[in-house]
């Protein structure tokens, strides 16, 4: 029996950082940001809203939506590129916050593709019979690693969390029909956080050289994002025995409107069926696709047999596609 999503949830901080706000702290303008990214505002977490907290709050909503109790969860997979600590894991911290029993809980790092990687792990666990009810969380507080003097990156990122419950297929659930994932470490330098790990530990020099902020080669990342997501999506569709016309909704990673539009043009999906949250939340990294999926399910009726195509791309480089079908 295939694995399915029983319920979803999301969490967004209350603080809003608009393009007008950014005009006051860096050389940029609302027009410059809007035309190049499609972003109008983004949410910024407070000091108390760290990644594990946002993920746990999203998880509470997913558990409620799935109509299960916390005691039924038997594994937690937490995707994040901005963990609270190198260790303990954000998964373990979220587990403690939620008051869930002592079940397996671990982090997954696939940057902005993290939600799809988490779904893939949960699908494998459920379909193998290893676990029955997996909580997938994706949350990132990237504002902690954004240089607000770098207009090429500070305009892009926002904070947030998303979650879903994955179990065996049941009526009203979203069946995880097919998954395609990939990575290319040879291109890792295109999008990274240079310091703070074992290769380049934190030091006075790394702080002075601003090496604890996100760096990105924008033009190269754009090209890879479009090409890799298109490949993953088309491979996923083919392996599922489907055609592009069989896709009813496209739910892409909310990185940049130009990237989203470039992907949408490559598929036979109407503009009205390309779901976007980018303008109001910006790029929320690993949580991006999960937030968009949760909002889509809360604001639209997904009919039986309709198919959703989720696509994402992130640092690593990493990319992926997932096909969901309403049952």
Swiss-Prot record:
Source species, domain of life: Bacteria
One Pfam family linked to the record: ACP_syn_III
Compartment(s) where it occurs, according to its Swiss-Prot or TrEMBL record: Cytoplasm
GO biological process: fatty acid biosynthetic process; secondary metabolite biosynthetic process
Alphabetical keyword list: Acyltransferase, Cytoplasm, Fatty acid biosynthesis, Fatty acid metabolism, Lipid biosynthesis, Lipid metabolism, Multifunctional enzyme, Transferase
Active site: 112, 253, 283
Associated pathway: Lipid metabolism; fatty acid biosynthesis
Keyword Cell division: no
InterPro entries assigned: ACP_syn_III_C (IPR013747), ACP_syn_III_N (IPR013751), FabH (IPR004655), Thiolase-like (IPR016039)
Broad class of where this protein is predominantly found: cytoplasm
Reactions performed catalytically: malonyl-[ACP] + acetyl-CoA + H(+) = 3-oxobutanoyl-[ACP] + CO2 + CoA
GO cellular component terms listed in the entry, alphabetical order: cytoplasm
GO molecular function, one term: beta-ketoacyl-acyl-carrier-protein synthase III activity
EC number: 2.3.1.180
Transferase found in the keyword field: yes
NCBIfam families from the UniProt entry: fabH, PRK09352.1
Notes concerning its domains: The last Arg residue of the ACP-binding site is essential for the weak association between ACP/AcpP and FabH.
Assembly mode: Homodimer.
Name of protein: Beta-ketoacyl-[acyl-carrier-protein] synthase III
């Amino acid at each position: 029996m295939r694995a399915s999503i029983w319920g979803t949830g999301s969490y967004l901080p209350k603080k809003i950082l608009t393009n007008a706000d950014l005009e006051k702290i860096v050389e940029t303008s609302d027009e410059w940001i809007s035309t190049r990214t499609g972003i109008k505002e983004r949410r910024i977490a407070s000091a108390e809203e760290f990644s594990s907290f946002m993920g746990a709050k999203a998880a509470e909503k997913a558990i409620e939506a799935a109509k299960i109790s916390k005691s039924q969860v038997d594994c937690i997979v937490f995707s994040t590129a901005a963990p609270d600590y190198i260790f303990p894991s954000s998964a373990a911290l979220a587990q403690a916050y939620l008051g869930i029993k002592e079940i397996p809980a671990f982090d997954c790092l696939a940057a902005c593709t993290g939600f799809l990687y988490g779904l893939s792990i949960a699908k494998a666990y459920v379909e193998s019979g290893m676990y029955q009810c997996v909580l997938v969380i994706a949350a990132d507080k990237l504002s902690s690693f954004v240089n607000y003097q770098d207009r090429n990156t500070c305009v892009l990122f926002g904070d947030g969390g998303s979650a879903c419950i994955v179990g065996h297929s049941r009526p009203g659930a979203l069946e995880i029909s097919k998954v395609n994932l990939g990575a290319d470490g040879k291109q890792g330098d295109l999008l990274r956080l240079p310091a703070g790990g074992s290769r380049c530990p934190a030091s006075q020099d790394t702080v002075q050289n601003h090496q604890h902020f996100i760096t990105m080669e924008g033009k190269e990342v754009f090209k890879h994002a479009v090409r890799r997501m298109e490949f993953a999506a088309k491979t996923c569709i083919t392996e599922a025995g489907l055609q592009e016309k069989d896709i009813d909704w496209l739910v892409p990673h909310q990185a940049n409107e130009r990237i989203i539009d470039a992907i949408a043009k490559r598929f036979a999906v109407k503009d009205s069926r390309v779901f976007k949250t980018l303008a109001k939340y910006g790029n929320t990294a690993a949580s991006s696709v999960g937030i968009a999926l949760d909002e889509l399910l809360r604001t639209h009726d997904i009919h039986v047999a309709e198919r959703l195509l989720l696509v994402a791309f992130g640092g690593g480089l990493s990319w992926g596609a997932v096909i969901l079908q309403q049952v």
